[in-house]
Regions:
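Metal- or metallocofactor-binding catalytic centers and their adjacent structured scaffolds
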Residues: 1-59
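Active-site mouth loops of central-metabolism enzymes
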Residues: 38, 74-90, 109-110, 137-144
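Catalytic pocket of metal/acid-base enzymes, prominently hydrolases
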Residues: 53-86
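Short, well-ordered coil/turn segments that N-cap beta-strands
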Residues: 72-78, 102-104, 130-132, 158-160
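Short, acidic/polar
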Residues: 86-99, 144-150
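Active-site gating/metal-coordination segments in enzymes
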Residues: 94-107, 112-115
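Catalytic core of soluble alpha/beta enzymes
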Residues: 108-172
Length: 172
């Protein structure tokens, strides 16, 4: 609440929600001197942006998807995010359950892979078979070189995507 009140509400008060794009740009630009790649400030900006689009839709009597240009796809791919089992075996079994329910992709958190990401990836791939996509969130845990080495090893299990392998500020 403090971030919103002290940093961003002054940019919004008195402005039209129909100007959501410009307001977002102003809010985002206001963070350039503080670093604008992540953190609570950008979370607050995202929340304000969504609220403005929602308000705009309510004022116009239209759903936000229409305001954003209308329907573009009949279906949108989705994946399961998170496997809250206590052990590798439980998480692999849960992955299989989700695939059996009709999902074709899942993401697991490398941070909770207590036996390591490779063991987790191998167990999940064995449980779900060769078709479904597997994504892993590495939670900014690695240096660039460590991430490259790990991702190369994960690719042996047909890794689809590695999310956040290095800190966003790590430009080396």
């Amino acid at each position: 609440q403090t971030i919103l009140e002290e940093m961003f509400i002054p940019f919004v008060i008195g402005r039209s929600p129909h100007d959501a794009e410009r307001i977002y740009e102003d809010l985002y630009d206001s963070q350039r001197v503080r670093g604008y790649f992540g953190g609570f400030a950008l979370d607050a900006i995202a929340g304000l942006d969504m609220a403005l689009w929602d308000l705009r839709g309510k004022l116009l009597g239209q759903p936000v998807w229409q305001l954003l240009g209308g329907k573009r796809h009949d279906r949108i791919p989705a994946y399961v995010s998170g496997l809250p089992g206590k052990t590798v075996a439980e998480r692999a079994a849960l992955a299989k359950e989700w695939m059996d329910r009709g999902f074709s992709a899942l993401k697991f958190a490398g941070a909770v892979a207590d036996a390591g990401e490779l063991v987790e990836m191998a167990a999940i791939r064995e449980a779900i078979g060769p078709g479904p996509k597997i994504l892993v969130d590495l939670h900014w845990h690695y240096t660039a070189l460590e991430a490259i080495r790990l991702i190369d090893q994960l690719c042996a299990y047909d890794l689809y995507l590695a999310e956040a392998p290095v800190a966003p500020e790590d430009i080396d």
